[in-house]
Curated annotation (Swiss-Prot):
Pathway: Porphyrin-containing compound metabolism; protoporphyrin-IX biosynthesis; 5-aminolevulinate from L-glutamyl-tRNA(Glu): step 2/2. It comes from the Archaea. Its EC number is 5.4.3.8. GO terms for molecular function: glutamate-1-semialdehyde 2,1-aminomutase activity; pyridoxal phosphate binding; transaminase activity. PROSITE patterns: AA_TRANSFER_CLASS_3. It is found in: Cytoplasm. Belongs to the class-III pyridoxal-phosphate-dependent aminotransferase family. HemL subfamily. Its main location: cytoplasm. One of its GO terms (cellular component) is cytoplasm. PANTHER family: GLUTAMATE-1-SEMIALDEHYDE 2,1-AMINOMUTASE, GLUTAMATE-1-SEMIALDEHYDE 2,1-AMINOMUTASE 1, CHLOROPLASTIC-RELATED. It catalyses: (S)-4-amino-5-oxopentanoate = 5-aminolevulinate. This is Glutamate-1-semialdehyde 2,1-aminomutase. It is an enzyme of class 5 (isomerase).
Length: 420
């Protein structure tokens, strides 16, 4: 007998490419459809409750339908949800973001992380007058042409890290280096004088997580400064995920520009980019670098974001608690069959089991993971009532909503997995 989800997917395949609105959701043989989310639980349209370790791929650090955010949204709805004019709400969120990031003196809000990285790259080119950018192999910075080159996340999952339709003349301006390899960066910048910026996930969240080796980010900062290249930290995942101020505060490295998204919108669509005032003042209408958007700074996203960041700022102890919870999962996995088949990587509330003998240090090593073993593992954890991102190349997340009992259930699901 077919499930409701199976019926919906069959219908959706005739209405939308692949039956979904984003590729990673096309889970074989068919995805489950969600009816509601509450706390750390998703309830499918077929009535199954799943402990959620995907959390919409990162935004929901407070879990689903968090009361303070829900109340803020409900209150704002009474006053409207889109004005097309400035509002108090964007000023408040800007103040919060700037206060939390010493590197950010001015900020522009957009509607997605992809828009944020696209605009930050344009701004870097406008500020420096240079044409090329450098990205890290396997780094994912959204689905726009300049960065769909050896891209991680769903692009690697589907085997299309270099997308069709991206013009070769554009791609030649996107240079690449391996992660955790400062010598390769130094060599590349020594040979190319027309580089405007390096864009990098300080912690590779869209292929892992893959963690920076000791002093790597400091060396990156030193090398880019020496070659007069702007450093853009893509903190769409790590912003407010690792703590107030993100990876740049965690690792003590100051970028020139920062991109944010996910958590800063409290679960509603948002993106942002910011940095030194002298750079940001080139953005229109203050300067000649154009960026605009109908939904930029919309009051609903601003309100949800402000409520989320205010709660996080007032409860910073949760970051230590989340770190303890991923440690508990790691300790449970170590002596299990799953642990014997892979390497557990974690940082704060980010975690992943890579099906390879050691934690990957770059994109090439991550791609050497056994994706067949991962699929077998993923199927078993789903049957145990745990929803993990359905790709070896996506990060798992925890939220403040996960209870001790749910952490134990996640650990038990990992321990119970068996392999042929």
């Amino acid at each position: 007998m077919k499930t409701v989800s199976e019926d919906l997917y069959q219908k959706a395949r005739g209405l939308m490419p692949g039956g979904v609105s984003s590729p990673v959701r096309a889970i074989a043989p068919y995805p489950f459809y969600t009816a509601r989310g509450s706390g750390a639980v998703l309830t499918t349209i077929d009535g199954t409750d799943l402990i959620d370790c995907c959390l919409a791929y990162g935004p929901l650090i407070l879990g689903h339908a968090f009361p303070a955010v829900q109340e803020a949204i409900a209150e704002q709805l009474q006053d409207g949800w889109l004005y097309g004019t400035p509002s108090l709400h964007e000023v408040r969120l800007a103040e919060q973001v700037i206060r939390d990031h010493p590197s950010i003196e001015m900020v522009r809000f957009v509607s997605s992380g992809s828009e944020a990285t696209m605009a930050a790259i344009r701004l870097a080119r406008g500020y420096t007058g240079k044409s090329d950018i450098v990205k890290v192999e396997g780094g994912f910075h959204g689905a726009h042409d300049a960065v769909l080159v050896k891209a991680g996340s769903g692009a690697t999952t589907l085997g299309v890290p270099d997308s069709a339709g991206v013009l070769p003349d554009l791609v030649r301006h996107t240079l690449q280096v391996p992660y955790n390899d400062p010598e390769a960066l130094e060599m590349l910048l020594s040979k190319h004088s027309d580089v405007a910026a390096l864009i990098i996930e300080p912690v590779m969240g869209n292929i892992g997580p893959i963690l920076p080796e000791e002093n790597y980010l400091r060396e990156v900062r030193s090398i880019t400064t020496a070659h007069d290249v702007l450093l853009i930290f893509d903190e769409v995942i790590t912003g407010y995920r690792l703590g107030i101020g993100g990876a740049q505060v965690c690792y003590g490295v100051t970028p020139d520009l920062t991109t944010l998204g996910k958590i800063i919108g409290g679960g509603l669509p948002i993106g942002a980019f910011g940095g030194r005032a002298e750079i940001m003042k080139l953005i229109a209408p203050a300067g000649p670098v154009y960026q605009a958007g109908t939904f930029n700074g919309n009051p609903l996203s601003m309100t949800a974001g402000t409520a989320t960041l205010a709660w996080l700022s007032a409860h910073q102890e949760i970051y230590h608690h989340l770190d303890d919870e991923t440690r508990a999962i790691e300790e449970a996995v170590i002596d299990s069959p799953a642990g014997a088949h892979g390497s557990f990587v974690r940082l704060g509330s980010l975690f992943k089991l890579f099906f390879r003998s050691s934690p990957p240090r770059d994109y090439i090593e991550a791609k050497q993971s056994d994706t067949t073993a991962f699929k077998e593992f993923w199927d078993q954890t789903l049957q145990s009532g745990i929803f993990l991102p359905p790709s070896q190349f996506e990060t798992n997340f925890l939220s403040t909503a996960h209870t001790e009992q749910q952490i134990e259930a996640i650990s038990a699901a990992y321990r119970s997995c068996r392999y042929e």
